[in-house]
């Protein structure tokens, strides 16, 4: 429900405000609590007199916000002094040049009701033993003066957000008021608008071990929303814990095309967008030209290393185009760049994957879609355990590849690197 003029009283937005960003703090335990008493629904009360920190969900929300903020031109942070707001700003870590604490960004004071439960009327109007809505609104209006500097970030509370929106004449919905959402308030010819900016969604295949697991962990740690595909959902739960608002699991079998469509469909159903695809699942079985050729194994290798990435690329392409800066990362190999042995199956299919990457780049470029081959030499995983050319400690580590994948997701369209050759020993690259 929008705030009324009666709620605002004499409070008015200051002159000279420029476009700015806003985050409501991440969730706390009180945000999660509701009860019903005598048929009336009551909500947890946390105002300026309740100084509690974020719960695990709130910390995740702050991480997601940080992913968004690091790509924005934040000129400075102005934060409420309450712990939940400070923790949100700290975890989000927008990396801007200045940080201020503003008492006027505190939540409304709910007096003796703090830490308990209250009816809707307590939040919508003046209420016994609570701070006057007009006085609260005047404080918020004063805090808005910080936005006279363009692109400042305000980190505060739900009540503050509702007053800000009312002062600027902007309608907001539950989508805007959710904990941890990054909002951009912008003005054109004295008309204000607000939009939600959320962190990118990346799909990653083959994530239960090795390179794929390191990629998924790195993306999660840096505030991406991820959709993870593996043959067994329980393996995903064992590796990453239960699903949450930023983490989606789906069955993915590189030999089962229907599982790929289902995975994309459920990702869209949960997140309503796809910004990146990492084709990591691969097959390194040995098909040796100097030995008898196992045609069935060669076909399996072709299907996993080339056909599955092709189908996933085709399924995701409409959503990647819609994002305007879609990213496809194909986990290739130095074996897709040169030939150093007789393992014809792996060499052929990785060269084929390079062809897919280049074709994807050609098709997607004008739509903002960028594709990259990451081509490592020996990586310290089970797939490289057969070699005695180099020890595991000297090999590329999965975490090294994960950083390159994230870098590919974050590079601008105007300066994209289409191939990363990654070496751990002296060898030919052609």
Curated annotation (Swiss-Prot):
<protein>
    <recommendedName>
        <fullName>Agropine synthesis reductase</fullName>
        <ecNumber>1.-.-.-</ecNumber>
    </recommendedName>
</protein>
<comment type="pathway">
    <text>Opine metabolism; mannopine biosynthesis.</text>
</comment>
<dbReference type="GO" id="GO:0016491">
    <property type="term" value="F:oxidoreductase activity"/>
</dbReference>
<dbReference type="InterPro" id="IPR020904">
    <property type="entry name" value="Sc_DH/Rdtase_CS"/>
</dbReference>
<feature type="binding site">
    <location>
        <position position="333"/>
    </location>
    <ligand>
        <name>substrate</name>
    </ligand>
</feature>
<keyword id="KW-0614">Plasmid</keyword>
<dbReference type="InterPro" id="IPR036291">
    <property type="entry name" value="NAD(P)-bd_dom_sf"/>
</dbReference>
<dbReference type="InterPro" id="IPR013078">
    <property type="entry name" value="His_Pase_superF_clade-1"/>
</dbReference>
<dbReference type="InterPro" id="IPR050259">
    <property type="entry name" value="SDR"/>
</dbReference>
<comment type="function">
    <text>Reduces deoxy-fructosyl-glutamine to mannopine.</text>
</comment>
<dbReference type="InterPro" id="IPR029033">
    <property type="entry name" value="His_PPase_superfam"/>
</dbReference>
<dbReference type="InterPro" id="IPR002347">
    <property type="entry name" value="SDR_fam"/>
</dbReference>
<feature type="active site" description="Proton acceptor">
    <location>
        <position position="346"/>
    </location>
</feature>
<dbReference type="InterPro" id="IPR015845">
    <property type="entry name" value="Mas1"/>
</dbReference>
<dbReference type="Pfam" id="PF00300">
    <property type="entry name" value="His_Phos_1"/>
</dbReference>
<feature type="binding site">
    <location>
        <begin position="203"/>
        <end position="227"/>
    </location>
    <ligand>
        <name>NAD(+)</name>
    </ligand>
</feature>
<comment type="similarity">
    <text>Belongs to the short-chain dehydrogenases/reductases (SDR) family.</text>
</comment>
<dbReference type="GO" id="GO:0006629">
    <property type="term" value="P:lipid metabolic process"/>
</dbReference>
<dbReference type="GO" id="GO:0032787">
    <property type="term" value="P:monocarboxylic acid metabolic process"/>
</dbReference>
<keyword id="KW-0560">Oxidoreductase</keyword>
<dbReference type="Pfam" id="PF00106">
    <property type="entry name" value="adh_short"/>
</dbReference>
């Amino acid at each position: 429900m929008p705030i009324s003029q009666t709620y605002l009283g004499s409070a008015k937005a200051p002159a000279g405000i420029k476009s700015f960003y806003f985050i409501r703090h991440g969730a706390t335990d009180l945000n999660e609590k509701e009860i019903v008493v005598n048929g009336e629904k009551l909500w947890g009360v946390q105002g300026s007199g309740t100084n509690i920190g974020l719960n695990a969900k709130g910390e995740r929300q702050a991480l997601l916000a940080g992913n968004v903020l690091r790509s924005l031109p934040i000129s400075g942070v102005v934060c409420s002094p309450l712990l939940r707001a400070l923790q949100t700003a700290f975890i989000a870590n927008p990396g801007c040049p200045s940080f201020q604490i503003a008492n006027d960004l505190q939540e409304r004071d709910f007096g003796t009701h703090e830490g308990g439960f209250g009816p809707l009327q307590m939040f919508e109007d003046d209420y016994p033993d609570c701070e006057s809505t007009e006085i609260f609104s005047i404080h918020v209006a004063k805090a808005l003066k910080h936005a006279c500097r363009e692109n400042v970030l305000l980190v505060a509370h739900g009540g503050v957000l509702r007053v800000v929106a009312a002062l600027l004449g902007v309608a907001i919905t539950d989508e805007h008021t959710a904990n941890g959402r990054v909002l951009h308030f912008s003005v054109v010819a004295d008309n204000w608008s607000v939009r939600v900016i959320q962190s990118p969604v990346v799909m990653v295949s083959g994530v239960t071990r090795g390179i794929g697991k390191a990629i998924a962990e790195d993306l999660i740690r840096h505030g991406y929303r991820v959709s993870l595909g593996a043959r067994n959902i329980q393996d995903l739960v064992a590796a990453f814990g239960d699903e949450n608002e930023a983490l989606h699991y789906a069955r993915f079998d590189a030999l089962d095309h229907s599982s790929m469509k289902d995975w994309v469909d459920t990702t869209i159903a949960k997140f309503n967008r796809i910004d990146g695809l990492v084709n990591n699942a691969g097959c390194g079985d040995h098909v040796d030209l100097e030995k008898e050729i196992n045609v069935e194994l060669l076909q399996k290798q072709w299907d996993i290393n080339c056909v599955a990435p092709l189908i996933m690329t085709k399924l995701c392409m409409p959503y990647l185009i819609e994002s305007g800066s879609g990213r496809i990362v194909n986990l290739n190999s130095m074996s897709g760049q040169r030939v150093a042995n007789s393992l014809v199956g792996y060499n052929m299919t990785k060269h084929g994957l390079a062809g897919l990457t280049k074709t994807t780049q050609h098709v997607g470029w004008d739509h903002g879609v960028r594709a990259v081959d990451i081509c490592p030499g020996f990586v310290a995983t089970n797939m490289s355990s057969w070699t005695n050319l180099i020890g595991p400690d000297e090999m590329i580590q999965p975490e090294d590849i994960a950083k390159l994948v994230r870098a590919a997701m974050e590079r601008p369209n105007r300066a994209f690197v289409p191939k990363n050759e990654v070496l751990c020993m002296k060898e030919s690259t052609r």
